[in-house]
Amino acid sequence: MIKRVALWQAYLAVGALLTALYVFVDPFAGSGPVINLLGLSPVIAIVVGVRRNRPASQGPWMWFAIGMTLFWLGDLYTYSYPRLFGADVPFPSLGDALYVTVYPALMAGLAMLIRRRNPERDRAGAIDSLIMTLGLALLSWVALIAPYLHDDSLTTLPKLVSIAYPLGDILLLAAAIRLAVDTGKRQPSFYLLTGAIVALLVTDFAYGLVTLQGNYHGQVILDVGWISFYLLWGAAALHPSMRELEQPAPERITRLTPL
C-alpha cells in the first residue's frame, strides 16, 4: 500500500527541488524570481496551515505571517533592484528597513507562543535561557557588534543598521533558547520551528562575518541558509502538530538551575 505524502512533506520536497535548481541549474542558478518564490512560500504555508490545522490561538501565526511577508518584501526589493536600476543595492536601503522590522514581528509571535506554552511562572527556565543567551550574545558582540561600532568607514546610519541585525538575532536566539528549555510539548512542528530559527541565526552570523571581511559577493551558499529558514518555518505551520505547539506539558527535567 502506497503511503500518502503529507502536505508538509510535499512542501519540503518541492522546496528542496527549487533550491537545487537555484543552486545548480542554469538559467535558474542565482535567479531572483526563484528565491522570491521560495521566500513567499512560508507566508502561503502559514495561511494554509492555520486554516487546515486550526490552532486554538491564531495570534502567534499571524505575527509569523507578517514577519515572513516583511522578509519576502525585503528579498523582493533586494533581488529586483539591480535588474530595475542597473546598479548595486545601496546600504542602507528600503530592503534593510524591511529586514529589520522582521525581528519585532517574529518576536511578537514567539512571545505569545512562549506565554501559552508556559502559563505558570517558570523562573528556572527564564534563568537558564538568560545564561545561555548571554554566552552566545558575547560571541556576537566580539565577532560582529564591536567591529561594526569601531568601523570608521561607516557613518552613523549604516553603523546603526549593521548593528541592528545581530541585535535582532540575539533576541530571536533568546526566544529559541526559551522554547528549548520550557515545559511545552516537543512535537515535529516544535523541531521544525526551532530549526528554522537556528538556520536564520547561523546564516546571518556567517553573512555578518564575510561582510566585515569584505568577502561577500552574493554567495549562493548563504542563500541556501535563508531558504532553509523559509522552508522549515513553512513546514512547521503545515505540520498537523502545530495545533499542539502552544500546549504546555508536565514538568520536564531540562534545567541548568535548581530553582
Regions found by a protein language model. Name each.
Residues 1-259:
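Polytopic alpha-helical membrane-helix bundles and their juxtamembrane interface segments
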